[in-house]
């Protein structure tokens, strides 16, 4: 389920309320949340920058036992890997990264020094 970690504005959902909501979701059987933010109040002051929502996922992960996915301008393979390794989140979502670079997975594998096996039909494009 996708939840809001904060609305970035007074009167909207804040981080403490997001924790309570996530804990209630877990209590009734939810096993996974994707933590986003903003978009439900009229004038949020969203600090848009790379990884700006990762701390929200980390907060939910620290306060539940659910699988948590982080979002928020995650495009750098090393940072995406660091988010997982540091247990800030269990998964990362990178929609815009894939839209701007359909070869993101291959490029990330090279950057992170992962040897991946590919069918011969695709190898010529790497």
Model-derived regions, located:
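Flavin-dependent oxidoreductase catalytic cores
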Residues: 1-126
């Amino acid at each position: 389920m996708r939840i809001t970690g904060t609305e970035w504005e007074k009167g909207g959902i804040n981080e403490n309320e997001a924790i309570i909501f996530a804990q209630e979701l877990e209590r009734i059987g939810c096993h996974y949340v994707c933590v986003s933010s903003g978009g439900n109040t009229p004038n949020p002051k969203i600090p848009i920058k790379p990884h700006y929502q990762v701390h929200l996922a980390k907060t939910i992960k620290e306060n539940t036992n659910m699988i948590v996915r982080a979002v928020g301008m995650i495009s750098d393979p090393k940072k995406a890997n660091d988010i997982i390794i540091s247990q800030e989140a269990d998964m990362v979502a990178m929609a815009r990264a894939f839209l701007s670079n359909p070869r993101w997975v291959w490029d990330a594998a090279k950057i992170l020094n992962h040897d991946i096996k590919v069918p011969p039909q695709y190898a010529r494009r790497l």
